[in-house]
Swiss-Prot record:
Signal peptide: none annotated. This is Mitogen-activated protein kinase 7. Pfam families: Pkinase (PF00069). The gene is Mapk7. It catalyses: L-seryl-[protein] + ATP = O-phospho-L-seryl-[protein] + ADP + H(+); L-threonyl-[protein] + ATP = O-phospho-L-threonyl-[protein] + ADP + H(+). GO terms for biological process: calcineurin-NFAT signaling cascade; cell differentiation; cellular response to hydrogen peroxide; cellular response to laminar fluid shear stress; cellular response to transforming growth factor beta stimulus; MAPK cascade; negative regulation of apoptotic process; negative regulation of calcineurin-NFAT signaling cascade. The lineage of its organism: Eukaryota, Metazoa, Chordata, Craniata, Vertebrata. It comes from Mus musculus. SMART domains: S_TKc.
Amino acid sequence: MAEPLKEEDGEDGSGEPPGRVKAEPVHTAASVVAKNLALLKARSFDVTFDVGDEYEIIETIGNGAYGVVSSARRRLTGQQVAIKKIPNAFDVVTNAKRTLRELKILKHFKHDNIIAIKDILKPTVPYGEFRSVYVVLDLMESDLHQIIHSSQPLTLEHVRYFLYQLLRGLKYMHSAQVIHRDLKPSNLLVNENCELKIGDFGMARGLCTSPAEHQYFMTEYVATRWYRAPELMLSLHEYTQAIDLWSVGCIFGEMLARRQLFPGKNYVHQLQLIMMVLGTPSPAVIQAVGAERVRAYIQSLPPRQPVPWETVYPGADRQALSLLGRMLRFEPSARISAAAALRHPFLAKYHDPDDEPDCAPPFDFAFDREALTRERIKEAIVAEIEDFHARREGIRQQIRFQPSLQPVASEPVCPDVEMPSPWAPSGDCAMESPPPALPPCSDPAPDTVDLTLQPAPPASELAPPKREGAISDNTKAALKAALLKSLRSRLRDGPSAPLEAPEPRKPVTAQERQREREEKRRRRQERAKEREKRRQERERKERGAGTLGGPSTDPLAGLVLSDNDRSLLERWTRMARPPAPAPAPAPAPAPAPSSAQPTSTPTGPVSQSTGPLQPAGSIPGPASQPVCPPPGPVPQPAGPIPAPLQTAPSTSLLASQSLVPPSGLPGSGAPEVLPYFPSGPPPPDPGLTPQPSTSESPDVNLVTQQLSKSQVEDPLPPVFSGTPKGSGAGYGVGFDLEEFLNQSFDMGVADGPQDGQADSASLSASLLADWLEGHGMNPADIESLQREIQMDSPMLLSDLPDLQEP
């Protein structure tokens, strides 16, 4: 029997055993718990939003240990956003540092699949009274956890598209040397258009470049156990981006079966579930385990072979299982990277190297390694808010257009010139008198013209004699008035302002491409509906004609084809028909008996049918095969017809496959049950089954069916008609205190996880201890509350009855 494993990892995952505190007497536990519960609700459920007149609060999305998030509408534009309120943000150093870290990271990232900061509200109170931080984020209706564990249809195309967006955002994040460390379905925000964004960067860290940074990496590590990588559980001291790829693999498997892949109830059970599927770790991994007793425990277990993924997910897509197997490996170096996963054949449908950017420059975590006080963290957060608004104001000034106004210079008005009439004789085209010489001017002529009217000369002055056919004074006055009006309008429009440079072409982003694809999909669906309507109308007419004159023999009837495809197939059918033989010469006329009927020699096979005559191309048999090959290749579809998309089974079908931990150590208890996620073979699609045809060319009928399918095929998964409301966990508000405390105090704590209801395991004791640090609670109160709600360390092994210390 394997030696019982004692606790080797502390609450921060660093390997130090946590200190033991004596339990409080039983008769005082109820009063302490009631006091702590009242304090938690009073400090956490503060949903009063003071956002001024710019935003209008709609409803509360969710609340948690770190804040409250509500949906809102911007009054000026009507745009809907999510506003996250972090109350008492500077009371606890851990929470204040988490807020600073998340603000810095989200300001650094600009990606379509990562939640973005739209605004940070400026403090409206003096610095000394500033306590709550308001962050305006993208509004997403739901999260992936709610989608998976609901009745919402989730097809293979949905899984493929969600996984592609997750890996696309992860590639961008990893290129900035950032590890998320807390990827789980509830932290992946989703909307009804199947768009996915990664949220909650409060646990993010940078890459470890030296062994001295391992302790920094594991500090405050309270990620959900079900998605935690083996190197974190075994203290392998190899903390790379592969940690996130393990979490992605667990999420991928959960989407395929709509059930958690490794729902461990405690530390040992989690290791057992992983080894039941992946087998015993390699000797190199076992030797790299940092804790001696953990290494001895694994070595004492009987060797186990890995289970094929086809057995775990029967009937699932082979390419999907191939990618899943490359994500879930014990060795971190053997796991596939996010960039390589995007190139996997399973995601080839969406992969576009030009639309999968990297982040430059890398994010700097130097501030996170410093020992900061609450006052310094508050100053840093205020500086981040001011920097955000300074950058946004600078961008607005760059795109603002203000024409410069300059005074108009004056100059002498040019003397009037007599303009001859166009109908005057050619000899009269010469001017009446040569133009007078302009007075010399030392200054250069200004660029502008004085448009002020000069006073008219006195009427007593003698006008020059007019020639026959010259333009009258009234005409010249009208022309001058028109010219003056034109010049005034040009000056009024700003001729002195510099010409506006042509707007540079904006780069096409993934969101714009997504909108273009959705618009194309909408137009395709409308065209498909129109074609379907015309097809039904044509079938109705054909049925009516068949009732009157017999059934229709058109092999293309009832198919949705474009005009070009239909003309191409008709041409191919004509080319495939054998050429008619030349008519034989008529024999010499001979007298025939008057009683004989005239006969004719048939030029081809005579049909035995007594029905009406049919064209030669429609007579089945060997004679109907094409005699000569067509001049071009047969039109083929771009790829094989995809299998019909199936909806993953509901959780009720998996109730009998519950993963029950063994009552004792491996090898001494009940037989272990492998995780089994039945999905069944995909049912045949009647729309894709080729129907028998009487056409003489079966390949023509097959091509017709394939082209008909290609006319309505949609490359994107169908949008959700309605999405379940999210819990707000993806916005970084922490676990839901209302639900957690109600379950803990009112209903008691269940023996095991409730499938489909929560995607979080027991949290670290440091989470509550840090949260209550500034609220005047003594260690006895904290210990009593921890024991009541069972918020034990994720590495605590003493909660198993069969793993007590000797």
